């Protein structure tokens, strides 16, 4: 009888193990189901992109002519910009040299440094005023007034 009791005891344990395995399998299937859903969602997203691409290929004839007209306008604008680039390069060459007094050599950050902009503007005007007067005299000589 002791053997029968052991077998009886062993059988419920085997059943419990099977139930646990079934529960675990269900959980795994549910997890895989969520994974399948995410992969299905990815497939849907890819599918949407493909559809969108197909729509881009099917352009009505009216819009094709409009795009061609816009392309012509863009080409004209590009030619105009190329002519102005030469003038901009000349303007950039006229820039004054960097004043070494404005360079901070301490290596520290300049945050919270109090700057008196009014004073700086006056100093710059005083320095540039001499240069401006020279330029104005040259311009006056080149410019002739016709009466």
From Swiss-Prot:
Residues 1-98, 128-147 are annotated as: Disordered. Residues 69-97, 133-147 have a biased composition (Acidic residues). Residues 1-25, 33-43, 54-68 have a biased composition (Basic and acidic residues). Forms a chaperone-bound H2A.Z-H2B complex that acts as a source for SWR1 complex-dependent H2A to H2A.Z histone replacement in chromatin. Keywords: Chaperone, Nucleus. One of its GO terms (cellular component) is nucleus. Forms a heterotrimer with H2A.Z-H2B, stabilizing the association of the histone dimer. Also, with a lower affinity, forms a heterotrimer with H2A-H2B. Residues 44-53 have a biased composition (Basic residues). The gene is CHZ1. This is Histone H2A.Z-specific chaperone CHZ1. It is found in: Nucleus.
